[in-house]
């Protein structure tokens, strides 16, 4: 696996909308998003000065997003939401490892 995590970009709206409007993906999360709601989510959670979400990529191709932000002074919230074609292939575990490494680097 060649995974990376990067800041979200405006150009991410198409795949983010596909993710957030997929009934299988959103089954246990929020109601399905409209394109306008996905755009608002991108700008508020991904493009803000202190983002809550980041794009997850495999060899430069977006596969979903990760959640990574301080929860309080002693803990952080981490998580992931992946496109269905990447489910069951070990990406969530690998992304969790990346997020833990990232958190450790920030503590130094």
Where are the predicted features?
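A short beta-loop-alpha structural element at the N-terminal edge
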Residues: 3-18
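Acetyl-CoA-dependent GNAT
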Residues: 10-11, 27, 31-79, 83-85
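Short loop-to-helix capping motifs
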Residues: 22-23
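Conserved acetyl-CoA-binding loop-helix of GNAT-fold acetyltransferases
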Residues: 88-103
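Conserved GNAT acetyl-CoA-binding A-motif
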Residues: 105-108
């Amino acid at each position: 696996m060649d995974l990376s995590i990067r800041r979200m970009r405006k150009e991410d709206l198409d795949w983010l909308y596909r993710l957030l409007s997929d009934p299988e993906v959103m089954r246990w999360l929020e109601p399905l998003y409209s394109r306008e709601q996905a755009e608002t989510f991108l700008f508020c959670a991904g493009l803000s000065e202190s983002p809550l979400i980041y794009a997850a990529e495999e060899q430069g191709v977006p596969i979903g997003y990760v959640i990574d932000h301080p929860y309080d002074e002693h803990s952080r919230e981490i998580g992931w939401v992946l496109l269905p074609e990447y489910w069951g292939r070990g990406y969530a575990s690998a992304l969790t490892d990346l997020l833990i490494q990232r958190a450790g680097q920030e503590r130094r």
